[in-house]
């Protein structure tokens, strides 16, 4: 019984601790560490539910065609939030479901459609439709970037207004909907005409961002990342916790000359820099430059 109670206490204990935070701070990382409001009191299992197994990050070089960009140099910096403020919706929260792969893919769909002028303002596309209907991926247990873009080119997705997100509270895939939540018929499904991969070529990634808009990427999450509050993240301490897919929206250089990528996360605005984070650029930090995929759209 005593062992059972100890195990139960460990199971329900907060995952982020002051002692671990102090250890990270003692290593003097270039970024600011703390216990984000988003994670206060959450257990390890609750935080782990936000991630997917690192096996989903394995790169299939044949799955998505290589992207090409013009030979002209990319601008020194680019921030989609500043250049196209009418195109980017608020930061959302995926809840207790490892659906980051769906959130980041449809975020990129919306961003890039608006960048191309197909949408005149920010439109939230439905991660729930992708989670429920994309049988090539694993719903709340994770997804492969090439696989979700295969789905988005063959099937597409609808708007979040039509099929709002539910898996964050249920933790389940749900049934692929045939009608909108209000009972009306599903409207036009928005498909990508193609998707290309700019991975492992930082200059090409920069040019693709500046000329086509945000891209979907993924990276390995270490335990110190959960303590991120602000600054340019670089892995400092801890073990692998899982994989995570995100929306890359820009790049720049800080006052100390450190190059970084700007990333939109899906853990709500109470994490990081109002829901965003920056991570070291040009060194494939945590695999962030490994798979970087952009979709293209015509209507």
UniProtKB/Swiss-Prot annotation:
Disulfide partners: 87-114, 97-140, 133-176
GO biological process: proteolysis
UniProt-listed InterPro entries: Papain-like_cys_pep_sf, Pept_asp_AS, Pept_cys_AS, Pept_his_AS, Peptidase_C1A, Peptidase_C1A_C
A GO molecular-function annotation: cysteine-type peptidase activity
Annotated Gene3D superfamilies: Cysteine proteinases (3.90.70.10)
Active site: 100, 244, 265
Pfam families: Peptidase_C1 (PF00112)
Superkingdom classification of source: Eukaryota
Primary location group: other
Subcellular location field: Vacuole
GO CC annotation, single: vacuole
Protein EC: 3.4.22.-
Range of residues in the leader sequence: 1-19
Keywords of this entry: Disulfide bond, Hydrolase, Protease, Signal, Thiol protease, Vacuole, Zymogen
CDD domains noted in UniProt: Peptidase_C1A_CathepsinB (cd02620)
Family as reported in the entry's similarity comment: Belongs to the peptidase C1 family.
Function noted in UniProt: Thiol protease which is required for parasite excystation and invasion of the proximal small intestine of the human host.
Protein name as it appears in the record: Cathepsin B-like CP3
Organism: Giardia intestinalis (Giardia lamblia)
Phylogenetic classification of the source organism: Eukaryota, Metamonada, Diplomonadida, Hexamitidae, Giardiinae
